[in-house]
């Protein structure tokens, strides 16, 4: 389906209903940004544009669905869904710690008193960037962030 002036929006819901594995990724050589947060934002925008163009017949994706495509969906497409892409027993621990307060805040919209976890997560995805990522873990090892150079069981 073409949205607007020739922009293509994939029929993701149709793919998923048919059992086609769908992952969300980024290729800075073929896009505007290498940021997965930006890829998630663009996926939300494109899916909602598709909903408008289809007059509501093809519902836009939710933030939770887009997050799933960016994590477990990508792992499943690569045949790695049993090892990575979500938290679980015997899975590799890949994670980020997001800073939402003070100097760690980056450009993220201010977290307000009373914001639940869902609201904070949405603010991070929609307005955050790498400056909000205060720690990054890959395969259980701290690869970026506070404590990386300290002698700890996690980061060393």
Task: State the predicted function of each range.
Residues 65, 153-156:
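Long, low-complexity intrinsically disordered regions
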Residues 3-6:
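Helical hairpin unit composed of two closely spaced alpha helices linked by a short loop
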Residues 10-109:
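His/Asp/Glu-enriched, well-ordered alpha-helical/loop segment
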Residues 92-151:
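C-terminal cap of metal-dependent C-N hydrolases
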Residues 1, 24-27, 139:
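Thr-Gly-centered strand-to-loop micro-motif
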Residues 36, 47, 120-125, 156:
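Generic hydrophobic, helix-prone segments enriched in Leu/Val/Ile
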